[in-house]
């Protein structure tokens, strides 16, 4: 095994100095070098957006492997399965490259072993690791290794409901039945079901599962806030805070006003009350003459009605404005006083009921503990578990079995975790148990922590950050702030926004120079004024937006969509490709509206992992309504849908003329009356409509007759062919996807009937049941256009980068500010536990004849939890905006909607510590309001973005524009568009042209980059043919395949082993083979075992021939010069096309060559079948010449010996070319 010492701090500093002095275009930053080579302690890398954290992780892993640490000695936790796969792929590529450059047999053997172990190394998600651990050691807890993960939500819900129902009945009939009924009623109110209580139990259970020890949390933390709540103490603290806070400010305000008002409004009656209020406040605050509670009530009495309101009518505009400003501020003070008075009343009532609340919640605690235990027992009985169960089993195994924990700690040289800011407490506990206390490497960025809904806790990262910052002995803190992604315009705008918004109060981190993004290269710093960040706001009257449309799930407005489309079309006209543009949405609710609008304007749009509803796609809905109408023409909805469809094109006017044929009855009866001119108004049935009716009634009758004696599959294809509907959708945008949907409908109908169910009626019934249940048929794989605008959520975009980014719905309200946010009957907090709204009966405290007087009271814990949850929610929204803004490489657009008048006037210029005041940031409800508040408070030069309001008049169809798309085809014209005699004659003429196109393909269809194999294929016809007499030859012309094909899976068929697969396996074997003085069959077998191919393919690799190769002169030469051997070497060179004289790049991979002092020996393995070596020598002569030319130019060496190693014949042949 290799052993190489790790760098000391002095050696790391030396490495930093060497890097700074180098002439590299892109140098490693000092912080990157520290992150790669530091060792011997826990390390936290705070990596800002685009700072190359993945690069750092890969380089650190490679450095450790280079020093003799095996890949199986590292624990590497990634956030997603995809990230783990990408990391493994990167490591394998880099290790393979290092293998080719290895100088000793020991090094080659070690690296080869590491490559082989990557697949089984502990690189993956924490869920994957805990499953592996429980598989191996679950027996210690009595868990069978054959357990199954319960991923189906329906299965989980069914099992939970069964356990809950049994337990609920037990409690309803138990010794505490009366108290339990009160508990349930507290959350269900007058509802006839206990669903609200069940939801509470499930939410507490789910929350507990995200902790390291659910049972411990339920016992110690669930009721912690309620146990510690002291309403009387809270009341006294609130009264004490009034003296130096609200009341002192109110006194100062009234004093200032009185000084001016006695001069300007001397005779106003309200001034007496103002003077009395000042006397009261001075007596209490200065002389302690009045009890605070009494003072509050007296002030509210004085301010009642218009007591403190200036009712004068000054003519002077300045005085009028002053009066209005006074009244507005006074009203705000009075509202705060009333709020305090209400809080004091609530605290008094809570103090009286506090002894009633705790026993009720203790019963809830017992219920949840019993539910958790019984639910787990039910899962154990079925040997099926949730991911959280497996994680807790793993923690228990390590905590309760020290010998197991020690074996893991001894195994891992380092415990690494990516995206550390999104760790949960369960994951953190696992990492603590796997680490030896000083070998953790954590990479993340708290500014990008956006997964609280998955129980991630950014405070875990923040605690480590503060600890390492204040106490370097506890661990090393490394900050990566250089951004290698974005241009300076994007970086400046991001810094401008967050340096004035984000701090530890809101955002959980102080965004100062330590965290500001810095351009990592000179190219990023080059100014591009046209790419300055733009805030685009669709100017709309806010009064037109109802409360129902506001909230975190509000829909995007048509104005915003039009605004975005206009900008995209403008970019497109400037030469920007659609694929360089990305839309970031807060959620997927906007997807459908965006897709419809973009399609109307001819802009291709691809949503990321959008679960499009197959049964709700327009073409499928039309076909389903067609089948419904055939099955039952009296179905008015289906019939009208079919009439309006492109197959028959009835418009609103046509339908109206049909509808007036009878006062009542089914629409089909009215249609027949219109057709036979026997209705109430036959005179309105004009000739054109009559022709449509004739076509429709005859076609429908034909389809109905056909359906009686043919399969649904045949009926569907008859509909497609009779009305050319399949061809019609082929002329629409996203044509391939639409045709795939229609094709799949026919296949699914066929599959349905093969199950034994027959008949159109039953098929429609099955589809309708699926729709009614809210489910869908499996969607057809989207045929995604390559050059298309991408659409994804901000969460999905994390870790990605795009040239042009539009952040949508900047005006969306945050959850904490929305009508439904934090307004439920309970809020759960990790530290304080459960806070509830208590249903109190105040009958005994208020004189009333009512049997009960129930009032909902917010407990102290509920109020505290709401404050914390609201602040945490706003902080995460701020981090989400940071993630969105840092995705852009070139230009960033922030798009919203609102009233220009309101947005430009509602914020002041108050600033605290160069930031918006906390109170303002805390109250702001949208990203857009943050931006506009910044725009008002700070200079534009500090913010680096521009704000532009767009009027509706600027978004007319003419102003927006249109992207040219292929016009849709009229179904009625398709019958004349078939292959007529003229087309046949034209095709005959074109055949000769096609032959010339094939002959001179290199000159006609020349790309900028080619591989040697492609060049061989392209130039073979030219090499083999002289002149143009090929025009007279009929053979050899291959028709172009343009139609989409749909292949069904062939289950059970054996994989066909192709020659190409065997060839690839052979090449990989020779690449992986560790060479020594004497190659043996065992060496070849070992190398073959590491080849990534099917066993059937490996069986076809002829090891005896390969072994014989090393007995040839060339084989011996290679073994004698192993240190000068290069294998799988990439190359690139410039070449000229002989037909067009155009330059192009040739790129490829050379199987191997020896770099000797006097010459280069080039060789290439070929597994093609041959009867005589000269065949392959001629075939590959051009390719080998290209290889030789590339090597000769690269090494400035004229002599290149070229050999083909032929493995496809009866015997192995080595042929010099």
Curated annotation (Swiss-Prot):
ATP binds at residues 47-54. Residues 515-799 form the UvrD-like helicase C-terminal domain. Residues 26-487 form the UvrD-like helicase ATP-binding domain. InterPro entries: AddA, DNA_helicase_UvrD-like_C, DNA_helicase_UvrD/REP, P-loop_NTPase, PDDEXK-like_dom_sf, PDDEXK_AddAB-type, Restrct_endonuc-II-like, UvrD-like_ATP-bd. Transmembrane segments: none annotated. It comes from the Bacteria. It catalyses: Couples ATP hydrolysis with the unwinding of duplex DNA by translocating in the 3'-5' direction; ATP + H2O = ADP + phosphate + H(+). Its cofactor is Mg(2+). One of its GO terms (cellular component) is DNA helicase complex. It holds the Pfam family UvrD-helicase. CDD domains: DEXQc_UvrD. GO terms for biological process: double-strand break repair via homologous recombination. GO terms for molecular function: 3'-5' DNA helicase activity; 3'-5' exonuclease activity; ATP binding; ATP hydrolysis activity; double-stranded DNA binding. Keywords: ATP-binding, DNA damage, DNA repair, DNA-binding, Exonuclease, Helicase, Hydrolase, Isomerase, Nuclease, Nucleotide-binding. The heterodimer acts as both an ATP-dependent DNA helicase and an ATP-dependent, dual-direction single-stranded exonuclease. Recognizes the chi site generating a DNA molecule suitable for the initiation of homologous recombination. The AddA nuclease domain is required for chi fragment generation; this subunit has the helicase and 3' -> 5' nuclease activities. Heterodimer of AddA and AddB/RexB. Belongs to the helicase family. AddA subfamily. PANTHER family: ATP-DEPENDENT HELICASE_NUCLEASE SUBUNIT A (PTHR11070:SF48), UVRD / RECB / PCRA DNA HELICASE FAMILY MEMBER (PTHR11070). This is ATP-dependent helicase/nuclease subunit A. It comes from Streptococcus thermophilus (strain ATCC BAA-491 / LMD-9). The gene is addA.
């Amino acid at each position: 095994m290799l052993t190489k010492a790790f760098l000391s701090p002095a050696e790391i500093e030396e490495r930093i100095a060497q890097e700074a002095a180098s002439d590299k275009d892109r140098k490693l930053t000092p912080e990157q070098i520290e992150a790669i080579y530091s060792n011997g302690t826990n390390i936290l890398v705070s990596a800002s957006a685009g700072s190359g954290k993945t690069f750092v992780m890969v380089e650190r892993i490679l450095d450790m492997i280079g020093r003799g640490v095996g890949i199986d000695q590292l624990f590497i936790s990634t956030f997603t399965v995809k990230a783990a796969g990408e990391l493994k792929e990167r490591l394998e590529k880099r290790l393979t490259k290092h293998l080719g450059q290895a100088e000793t047999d020991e090094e080659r053997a070690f690296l080869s072993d590491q490559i082989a172990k990557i697949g089984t190394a502990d690189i993956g998600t924490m869920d994957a690791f805990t499953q592996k651990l429980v598989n191996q050691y679950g027996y210690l807890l009595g868990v069978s290794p054959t357990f199954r993960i319960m991923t189906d939500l329906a299965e989980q819900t069914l099992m939970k409901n069964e356990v809950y129902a049994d337990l609920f009945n037990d409690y309803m009939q138990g010794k505490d039945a009366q108290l339990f009924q009160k508990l349930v009623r507290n959350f269900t109110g007058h509802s006839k079901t206990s669903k609200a209580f069940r939801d509470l139990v499930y939410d507490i259970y789910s929350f507990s599962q995200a902790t390291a020890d659910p049972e411990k949390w339920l016992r110690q933390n669930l009721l912690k806030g309620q146990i510690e709540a002291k309403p009387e103490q809270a009341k006294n603290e609130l009264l004490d805070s009034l003296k130096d806070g609200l009341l002192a400010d109110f006194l100062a305000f009234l004093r200032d006003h009185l000084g001016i008002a006695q001069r300007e409004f001397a005779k106003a009656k309200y001034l007496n009350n103002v003077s009395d209020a000042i006397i009261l406040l001075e007596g209490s605050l200065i002389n302690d003459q009045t009890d605070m509670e009494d003072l509050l009530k007296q002030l509210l009495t004085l301010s009642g009605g218009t007591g403190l309101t200036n009712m004068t009518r000054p003519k002077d505009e300045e005085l009028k404005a002053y009066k209005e400003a006074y009244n507005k501020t006074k009203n705000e003070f009075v509202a705060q006083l009333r709020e305090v008075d209400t809080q004091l009343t609530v605290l008094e009532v809570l103090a009286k009921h506090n002894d009633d609340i705790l026993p009720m919640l203790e019963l809830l605690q017992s219920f949840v503990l019993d539910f958790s235990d019984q639910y787990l027992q039910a899962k154990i009985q079925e040997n099926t578990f949730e991911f959280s169960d497996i994680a807790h089993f793993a923690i228990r195994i390590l905590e309760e079995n020290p010998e197991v924990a020690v074996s893991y700690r001894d195994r891992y040289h380092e415990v690494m975790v990516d995206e550390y800011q999104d760790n949960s407490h369960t994951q953190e506990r696992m990492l603590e148990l796997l680490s030896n206390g000083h070998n953790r490497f954590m990479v993340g960025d708290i500014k990008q922590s956006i997964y609280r809904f998955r129980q991630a806790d950014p405070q875990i990262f923040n605690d480590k950050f503060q600890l390492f910052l204040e106490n370097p002995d506890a661990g090393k803190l490394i900050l990566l702030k250089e951004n290698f992604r974005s241009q300076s315009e994007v970086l400046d705008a991001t810094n401008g926004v967050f340096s004035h918004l984000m701090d530890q109060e809101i955002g959980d981190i102080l965004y100062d120079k330590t965290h500001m993004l810095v351009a990592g290269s000179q190219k990023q710093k080059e100014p591009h004024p046209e790419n300055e960040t733009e805030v685009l706001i669709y100017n709309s009257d806010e009064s037109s937006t109802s409360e129902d449309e506001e909230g975190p799930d509000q829909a995007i407005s048509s104005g915003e969509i039009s605004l975005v489309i206009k900008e995209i079309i403008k970019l497109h006209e400037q030469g920007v490709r659609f694929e360089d543009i990305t839309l970031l949405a807060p959620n997927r609710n906007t997807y459908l509206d965006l897709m419809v609008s973009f399609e109307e304007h001819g802009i291709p749009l691809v949503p990321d992992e959008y679960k499009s509803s197959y049964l709700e796609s327009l073409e499928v809905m039309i076909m389903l309504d067609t089948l419904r109408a055939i099955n039952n023409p009296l179905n008015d909805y289906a019939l009208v849908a079919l009439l309006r469809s492109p197959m028959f094109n009835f418009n609103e006017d046509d339908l109206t003329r049909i509808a007036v044929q009878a006062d009542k009855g089914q629409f089909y009866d009215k249609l027949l009356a219109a057709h036979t001119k026997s209705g109430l108004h036959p005179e309105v049935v004009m000739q054109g409509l009559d022709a449509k009716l004739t076509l429709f009634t005859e076609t429908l009758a034909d389809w109905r007759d056909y359906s009686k004696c043919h399969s649904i599959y045949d009926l569907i294809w008859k509909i497609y062919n009779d009305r050319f509907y399949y061809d019609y959708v082929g002329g629409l945008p996203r044509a391939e996807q639409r045709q795939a949907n229609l094709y799949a409908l026919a296949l699914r109908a066929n599959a349905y009937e093969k199950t034994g169910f027959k008949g159109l009626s039953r098929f429609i019934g099955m589809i309708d049941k699926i729709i009614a249940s809210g489910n869908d048929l499996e969607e057809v794989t989207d045929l995604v256009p390559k050059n298309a605008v991408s659409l994804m959520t901000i969460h999905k975009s994390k870790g990605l980068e795009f040239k042009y980014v539009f952040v949508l719905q900047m005006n969306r309200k945050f959850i904490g500010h929305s009508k439904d946010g934090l307004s439920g009957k309970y809020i759960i907090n990790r530290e304080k536990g459960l806070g509830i709204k208590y249903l109190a009966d105040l009958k005994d405290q208020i004189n009333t004849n009512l049997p009960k007087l129930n009032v909902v009271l917010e407990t102290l814990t509920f109020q505290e939890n709401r404050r914390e949850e609201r602040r945490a929610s706003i902080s995460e929204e701020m981090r989400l905006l940071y993630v969105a803004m840092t995705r852009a490489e070139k230009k960033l657009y922030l798009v919203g909607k609102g009233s220009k008048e309101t947005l430009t006037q509602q914020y002041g210029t108050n600033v605290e510590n160069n930031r918006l005041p906390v109170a303002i940031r805390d109250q702001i409800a949208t990203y857009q309001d943050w931006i506009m508040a910044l725009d008002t408070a700070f200079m534009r030069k500090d913010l680096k973005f521009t704000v532009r309001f767009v009027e509706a008049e600027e978004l007319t169809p003419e102003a927006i524009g249109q992207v040219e798309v292929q016009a849709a085809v009229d179904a009625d014209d398709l019958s004349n568009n078939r292959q007529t005699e003229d087309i046949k004659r034209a095709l005959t003429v074109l055949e000769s042209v096609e032959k010339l196109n094939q002959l001179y393909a290199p000159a006609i269809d020349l790309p900028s980059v080619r591989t040697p194999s492609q060049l061989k294929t392209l130039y073979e016809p030219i090499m083999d043919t002289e002149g143009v007499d090929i025009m007279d030859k009929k053979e050899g012309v291959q028709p172009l395949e343009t139609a989409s094909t749909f292949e069904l899976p062939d289950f059970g068929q054996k994989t066909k082993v192709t020659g190409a697969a065997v060839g690839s396996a052979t090449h990989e074997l020779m690449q992986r083979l560790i060479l020594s003085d004497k190659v043996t069959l065992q060496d070849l077998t070992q190398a073959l075992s590491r080849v990534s191919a099917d066993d059937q393919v490996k069986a076809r690799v002829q090891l005896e021939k390969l072994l014989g190769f090393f007995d040839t002169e060339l084989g011996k030469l290679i073994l004698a010069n192993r240190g000068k051997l290069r294998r799988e070497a990439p190359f690139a060179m410039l070449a000229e096309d002989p037909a067009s004289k155009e330059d192009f790049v040739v790129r490829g991979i050379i199987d191997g060559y020896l770099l000797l002092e006097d010459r280069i020996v080039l060789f290439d393995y070929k597994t093609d079948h041959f009867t005589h070596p000269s065949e392959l020598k001629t075939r590959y002569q051009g390719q080998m010449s290209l290889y030789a030319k590339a090597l000769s130019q690269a090494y400035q060496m004229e002599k290149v010996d070229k050999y083909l190693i032929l493995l496809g014949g009866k015997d192995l042949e080595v042929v010099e070319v």
